[in-house]
C-alpha cells in the first residue's frame, strides 16, 4: 500500500482512492457504516472533477513546453543565420583587405620604380650597390610593418565578429577608415622616404665605417697587451724556476752543514748567511708568486676579451658575407629589371608607332567618308535635278543634255564604287591592325615568359659551370696527390732496393742454416721467395703490392 502514492496521481483518481483506502485501513471497519451512499457519490464526483482539472493542467503544461521548445529552435536557427551572416561579412572584409593590400603593393612598386628612376637620374654618379641594398632593406621592413598592421586589423575583425549585428556597420566603416589611413600613411611615407633616404644612408655608412675602425684598433691593442703579458709571464716563470733551484741548493747546503756538527765557526757564519739568503729568496718568491697571480688574472681577462672580440669578428664576417650575397642578388635583380624596362620601352615605342599609324588611317578613313557623303549629296541633288528636268521638260529635253547627265551619273557611280572599295580596304586594314595589337599583347606576355625562362636557364648553367670548375679543381688536386704518392712509392721502393742490395753481401758471408739433405734443389725456391721479403724484418710476402704496404708500415 505504501507504493501506491508514487504512481501518477493524475490518472483515473488512483491517488485519492489510495488515501481513502489507507484511511480506512488505519481506522476501524465500523467507519464505513457512517458514510451514506449519497456522500460516497459526492466524493466520487469531486475526485473525478479534480482528476479532469489535473489532466487539463498537464495538457496546458505540455503545450507550454512545446511552445517553449519551438521558440528555442527558432532562436537557434536565428543564431545560426546571424553567425553565417557574420562569417560571410568577415570573408568579404578579408577579401576587400587582400584586394586593398594587393593594390597598395602595386602602388608601392610603381612609386618605388618612379623613385628609382628619379634617383637614378639625379644621383647616377654617387649611387652605389650598397645604398640600393639598404634602400631595399628599408622598403622590406616597411612592408613587413604594413603586413603586421593588416594582420592586427584582421584579428580585430575576428574579435568583432562575436558582437551583435548592430555593430556590423560600424566594423565595416572602421575597416574602410583603417584601409584608407594605411594607404595615406604609405603615400606619406613614400614621399618622405624619397627626401630622407640619401642622408640616412650616408650617415649610416659613415657610422659603420667608424665603428669597424674603432673595433679593429681595440682588437690590435688587446692583442699587443696579450703578447706583452705572455712574455712577462714567461720571464717571471723562468725567474721563479731559477730561484727555486737556488733555494733547493741552499737547503741542501744547510742540511749538509747541520749533519756535519763538528765544523768551524766560519761554517756556522756561512750557514747563517745562507739562512738569511734563503729568507730573502723566500720573500722574493712570494713577491714573484703574487706577480704571477696578477699576471694570470690579467691573462684570463685578456683571453675573455679576445674571445668576445673573436665572436664579434665572426658575427661581422657573417654579416658581411650575407650582405655581399644580398648585394649580388640585388645587382642581378636590378640588371634584369633594367633589361625588362628597356624591353618594355621598346615595346611601348612600337605600340605608339602602331597607334600613330592607326590614327592616320582613321583620319584618312574619316576624310574619305566625308568625301563619300559629299558625293552622295551631289548625286542626290543630280538625281533630283534629273527628275525635275524630266518632269518639266519631258518633251523639250535635248539628247545632249541627257547624255551629259547620264555621263555625270556614271562618273558619280564610278567614284562612289571607288570610294566604297577604298573604304572596304581601310576597314580591312583597321581589322588587321587591331589583330596585330592583340598579337602584340600576346607576344609581350610570351616575351616575358621567355625572358624568365632564359634567366632561369642561365642561372642553372652558371651553377653547372661552377660545379664543373670545382670538380676540375678537385680532379687536378687528386691527380697531383696520386702523382706525389706514386713518386713516394717509387722513391721508397728505390730506397728499399738499395738497402736490400747493400745487405745482400752480408747475408752471403753469414752461415747457411739449411739442412743437409736439401742441397741445390731448394736454393732457387729460396731465391724466388726472398725476392718479396721485407729488408728490415725479413718477413716473406707473396706479391709486390703486399710487400709495399708492409714496408711502409714497417718503416713507420
UniProtKB/Swiss-Prot annotation:
Motif (UBAN) on chain:
453-458
Q: Where is the composition biased (Polar residues)?
A: 253-265
The principal localisation class reads: cytoplasm
What's any GO biological process attached to this entry? Golgi ribbon formation
Please indicate which superkingdom the organism of origin belongs to: Eukaryota
List every stretch annotated Disordered: 1-33, 245-274, 496-524
Q: Which PROSITE patterns match?
A: ZF_CCHC_NOA
**Name listed for the protein in its UniProt record:** Optineurin
List the source organism. Gallus gallus
